[in-house]
Amino acid sequence: PEILDVVHLIMENNKSIQFVLTGSSARKLRRAGVNLLGGRALKLSMHPFVAKELQGEFSLEGALVHGMLPIVYGAASPLRKLEAYIDLYIREEIQQEGLVRDLGSFTRFLEAISFSHGSQLSISSVARECGVKRTTVDGYVDILRDLLVADVVPVFSKRAKRELVSHGKFYFFDTGVWRTLRPKGPLDNPSEIDGA
C-alpha cells in the first residue's frame, strides 16, 4: 500500500512518467484507506480469453468444460489447474486476508451459489441453503465481486421505475471456475448441468 503514495509523488513531480500496477483486488487497499490515485489511474480488468484471441486453437467444448483462464487453457491437466486456482486463489486468499470469519460457511456458500450461475440471484435462498444470515451472504457476494470472480448483472428495464423486488442475474467470470465449484452427485446428468 505504501507504494501508491510513492507513485503519487512521482506522478505529481513528473507528469510524463507512467506506471502499470497490477493486483487481484483493491478490497484490502480500500479497507486500509490508502491513496488510490483518484483521478490519475485507470482501472482495467483482465478477463479470460475470448474465441477471437485463440483463433484456430479455440475449442467450444473445451471452453464450456474448462473455461478460458490463461493458466488453464491448454494445460495438460485443466481440471487440476482449476482446482488449484480455486484452492489457492479463492479460498486461501480469502482466508489469509481475513475476509471471512468462518471458512466452512464460505465454502458451503461457494457450492450453494454455484447453482445460481446464470440465474436470478435470491440472496435469501442461498442464505437458507448455507444456514447463515442474509447479510452474511450479501457480504460473501461482495467479496466475490471485489475479487473479480463473479458479478451480478442488474435487471434491465426500458423506463426508470421503482421496483419493490428485482433480482439481478449472478455469473461467475469463467465457466471452468463455475463447473469446478458446482457439486456433482452420482445421479447428475452432465447435459442437465450444462443447461441442455
Residue ranges and their predicted role:
Residues 24-29, 49-52, 177:
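Conserved nucleotide-binding/hydrolysis micro-motifs of P-loop NTPases
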Residues 9-10, 27-42, 57-59:
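Short regulatory helix/loop adjacent to the ATP-binding pocket of P-loop NTPases
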Residues 42-55, 76:
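Conserved AAA+ ATPase "SRH/arginine-finger" region at the nucleotide-binding site
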Residues 56-89, 95-99:
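Amphipathic alpha-helical "lid/sensor" segments that cap RecA-like P-loop NTPase cores
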Residues 18-24, 45:
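Structural recognition of the conserved hydrophobic beta-strand(s) that form the central parallel beta-sheet
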Residues 2-20:
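Conserved Walker B catalytic segment
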Residues 3-4, 30-32, 55-56, 75, ...:
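Short glycine-/acidic-enriched loop or helix-start segments at secondary-structure transitions
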Residues 80-196:
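Accessory nucleic acid-recognition modules appended to NTPase machines
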